[in-house]
Design a protein with these regions (language model features):
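RNA pseudouridine synthases
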Residues: 1-199
Length: 199
């Protein structure tokens, strides 16, 4: 039966099941034959990773042409001002491509208080302030969010995917390294597709 799994991927875990010499992989966290990641999450990024055993669902969740949004919380160097936020929202040229318009906002300290400590902790320079921003995109090019924040002068220190395809990590209450199975009707993008197919 087609299914979807939501995992809170910890920092340092490689987004594959096959063994790797240098990093732990998804196999160290879950044993789910026939399930594969719907999209990827860099080894040094954390947060929501969706996995499925259904090829069409995998495509619908991960491929930009279907418009599935992904939301990230990025801890960046410096005090991000209005100009940088507007540039990210409009889209920036990164050399090989120009990003589509994004939704972007500064996060308050009270919002990020829900986050878990990263292991190992990030390297913070005492003389340089940092802050958190939220970015929602629908593309997902290689290291896109990190490249975007660096382009506007704010290198990324920590990156967490908090939502994808209508699934919110905080709603699931998953601690790092834990996972849960989702029903199709809990994944809004797939539920909408199923409704269209039955009409």
């Amino acid at each position: 039966m087609p299914g979807v799994i939501a995992l809170n991927k910890p920092y340092g875990v490689l987004c594959q099941f096959s063994a790797h010499e240098a990093h732990p992989t998804l196999a160290s966290l879950l044993d789910v034959p026939e399930y594969y990641p719907a999209g990827r999450l860099d080894t040094d990024s954390e947060g929501l990773l969706l996995l499925t055993n259904h090829g069409p669902w995998q495509a619908r969740i991960s491929q930009p042409r279907f418009g599935a949004e992904k939301t990230y919380w990025a801890q960046v160097e410096g005090d991000v001002g209005a100009d940088a936020l507007q540039a990210l929202a409009r889209g920036v040229t990164l050399g090989d491509f120009t990003t589509a318009p994004a939704r972007v906002r500064r996060l308050a300290d009270e919002e990020t208080a829900v986050l878990w400590p990263r292991v190992p902790p990030i390297r913070v320079r005492k003389t340089v302030p940092d802050c958190w921003i939220e970015l929602t995109i629908h593309e997902g090019k290689n290291r896109q969010v990190r490249r975007m924040t660096a382009h506007v002068g704010h290198p990324c220190l920590r990156l967490i995917r908090v939502a994808a395809a209508g699934v919110n990590l905080f709603d699931l209450g998953l601690a790092p390294g834990t996972w849960c199975a989702l029903r199709a009707d809990e994944l809004p993008l797939l539920a909408a597709q199923a409704r269209r197919q039955t009409q």
